[in-house]
Amino acid sequence: NTVCTLRAEENCVFYIAYALYEGVGETLHIRFDPNAPLGPMHEVHGEGTFQREVFIMLGDKTPASRLLCGYTFGPDSGWTSWPPHEHAAMLEETYCYFDMPAPKMGYQITYLEENGLYSDAVAHPVRSGNMVVFPCGYHPTVASPGTRNTYLWALVALRPEDRVYGIYNKDKNYI
């Protein structure tokens, strides 16, 4: 067991992501740097209205049992998690939205697809302070006009060998 004390010197939000610990890795604190150069921790994904910046704070090269996490900053009025994807066979994902105060918002869409048929489609408005958990299904998200989707994402591997960043199944209707 590790004891950790966090102290804020100004108004802030702490995000604490965790997963089952199986003896791999150590407790660590990683300070977010929005000016990090492009490289292993700062990538650009997608193109056009779904291009976004991804900051990988705890990637698969850092020793850990099951956790991966980072931040996504989408374009103004654009899509993130596009094309739609899912990774339920290996990973469960959570999004924690921030820097989207009311009236700004996005829409988190989730749905299942089987044999080319969609089911259980749901769209939820999301903004700062909202958290969405995806145990299964495709989960694209879009920002309303004048808004950027910004969220912390945490992926938890169902098995230690599934702890790999970038493994997902794209919805074949969008390939």
Regions found by a protein language model. Name each.
Residues 1-175:
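Jelly-roll (double-stranded beta-helix
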